[in-house]
C-alpha cells in the first residue's frame, strides 16, 4: 500500500481534519479573510480528503458537495447561509502567504536546470522561501435537483499536499465550532500541530511572525496582547 493511500485512510475520521502545514500559518495579502471563510475552508478540505480516500473526486480533479453540508460542518447559522457565496468568493480571491512553522517544512528543492541539480552537485534545498497562493483555484456554484451545490478545485502545485498531507495538524471540528474570532481559529490550528510534541511547546518564532499569522487582514492593526 502506498504512503499516499495510508495518509488518506488516516484522514477519514468523522469530525477530524488532518490539515496540511501549508494551510495553517497563512497571512492574507490582498484582502480580509473572515473567520467564517477560514472555517468553511477547513470543512471543504475535510470533504475533499474523504472523497479522495473513497476515490469519488471528479475526473478533472475537482471536489463537490451540497452547500448545506459545508455550512453544517462548522455549525453555520441561517444568517450565514444567506451569505455563503460571499465566503466562497473569499477563498478564490484571497491571496495568502504561507509561513512555514519550521525550517524543516520548506521541503521543495530549488530548480537550476532540467534535472533540478546544480552542476556537479546535489539538489539545493530551499532555506528562505516566499510562497503566495490562492486558497482555491476555481469554484462553481450551481443547483442540482433544486439544491445548491459547490464544486471546487485547489491550485495544482499544492493540491496533493492539501488532500493527502505529509505533515499536518489534527483539527477537531467540535472545538472549531466554538471559536468565534479569526485569531482564535488561527491560533488553535497552529497550536494543534504541536499537540503531541514531547516538549509541549510550539516552534520558536519572532513575535512579529505570530502577530502577522493571527491577523485576518493585511490592513488590520497589530493587536497589543497586553491589552484586552
For each of these PLM feature ranges, what is it?
Residues 1-228:
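Charged, alpha-helix-forming regions
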Amino acid at each position: 500500500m502506498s504512503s499516499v493511500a495510508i495518509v488518506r485512510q488516516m484522514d477519514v475520521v468523522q469530525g477530524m481534519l488532518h490539515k496540511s502545514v501549508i494551510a495553517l500559518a497563512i497571512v492574507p495579502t490582498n484582502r480580509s479573510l473572515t473567520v467564517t471563510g477560514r472555517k468553511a475552508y477547513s470543512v471543504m478540505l475535510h470533504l475533499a480528503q474523504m472523497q479522495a480516500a473513497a476515490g469519488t473526486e471528479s475526473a478533472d480533479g475537482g471536489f463537490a458537495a451540497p452547500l448545506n453540508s459545508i455550512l453544517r460542518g462548522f455549525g453555520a447559522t441561517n444568517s450565514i447561509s444567506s451569505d455563503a457565496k460571499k465566503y466562497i468568493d473569499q477563498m478564490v480571491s484571497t491571496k495568502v502567504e504561507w509561513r512555514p512553522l519550521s525550517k524543516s517544512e520548506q521541503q521543495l528543492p530549488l530548480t537550476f536546470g532540467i534535472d533540478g541539480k546544480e552542476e556537479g552537485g546535489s539538489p539545493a534545498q530551499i532555506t528562505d522561501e516566499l510562497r503566495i497562493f490562492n486558497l482555491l483555484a476555481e469554484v462553481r456554484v450551481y443547483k442540482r435537483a433544486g439544491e445548491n451545490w459547490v464544486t471546487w478545485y485547489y491550485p495544482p502545485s499544492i493540491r496533493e499536499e492539501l488532500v493527502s498531507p505529509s505533515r499536518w495538524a489534527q483539527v477537531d471540528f467540535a472545538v472549531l465550532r466554538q471559536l468565534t474570532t479569526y485569531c482564535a481559529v488561527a491560533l488553535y490550528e497552529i497550536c494543534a500541530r504541536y499537540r503531541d510534541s514531547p516538549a509541549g511547546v510550539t516552534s520558536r518564532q519572532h513575535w512579529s511572525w505570530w502577530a502577522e499569522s493571527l491577523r485576518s487582514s493585511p490592513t488590520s492593526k497589530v493587536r497589543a496582547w497586553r491589552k484586552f
